[in-house]
């Protein structure tokens, strides 16, 4: 009986060696394919990002601009949306482009909000402004949205991930978000 057991173990080891050799040989091609796919995806994202409008201004005084928007919001009876992110962030640029090129969403924003692209980048992290709004990017990533009332009071912070659909955004989810915090119905 012990010789049978030893033979069984030896056969298992022998077949393991063959399968390991095969796996090691086969693993090279998929790794090369994966690297090529990753490089192609990176290039496609870079090309897409290059074509999209760049709404964030790293040199702008965000604190002063938001103060101006609060005054304007009172006069126009609108809330404010701060879209936090940067020109480095493809999802930030996609969201901006999505809203600007979707007439229904653009109309909701134009009718109900003053919209500001709050820059977060290596050049200008706007740390003081972000701290005032509880550093939403640390919690949710970018883009992240902060809704302010006409007095500048924070009403809501919106994670953008729940608005995504595929490689873009859901019109219905974004519309629902915009309408929920709108000043007018």
Describe these PLM feature segments:
Residues 1-7:
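Bacterial N-terminal signal peptides
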Residues 10-60:
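Sec-dependent signal peptide cleavage junction
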Residues 61-80:
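A short beta-strand-turn-helix
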Residues 76-90:
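Short active-site neighborhood of thiol/selenol oxidoreductases, capturing the structured segment around
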Residues 89-93, 145:
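The canonical Cys-X-X-Cys-His
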Residues 93-108:
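Typically the conserved alpha-helix immediately C-terminal to a functionally engaged Cys/Sec
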Residues 110-162, 166-173:
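Thioredoxin-like thiol-disulfide oxidoreductase module
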Residues 182-185:
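Short, solvent-exposed mixed-charge patches
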């Amino acid at each position: 009986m012990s010789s049978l057991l030893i033979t069984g173990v030896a056969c298992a080891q022998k077949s393991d060696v063959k399968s390991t050799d095969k796996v090691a040989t086969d693993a090279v091609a998929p790794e090369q394919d994966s690297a090529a796919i990753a490089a192609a995806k990176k290039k496609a994202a870079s090309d897409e990002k290059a074509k999209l409008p760049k709404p964030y201004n790293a040199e702008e005084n965000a604190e002063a601009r938001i103060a101006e928007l609060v005054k304007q919001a009172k006069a126009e009876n609108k809330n404010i949306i701060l879209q936090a992110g940067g020109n480095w962030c493809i999802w930030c640029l996609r969201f901006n482009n999505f809203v600007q090129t979707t007439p229904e969403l653009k109309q909701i924003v134009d009718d109900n909000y003053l919209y500001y692209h709050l820059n977060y980048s290596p050049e200008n992290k706007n740390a003081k402004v972000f701290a005032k709004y509880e550093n939403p990017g640390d919690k949710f990533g970018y883009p992240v949205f902060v809704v302010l009332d006409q007095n500048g009071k924070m009403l809501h912070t919106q994670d953008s991930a729940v608005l995504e659909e595929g490689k873009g955004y859901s019109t219905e989810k974004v519309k629902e978000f915009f309408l929920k915090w709108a000043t007018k119905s």
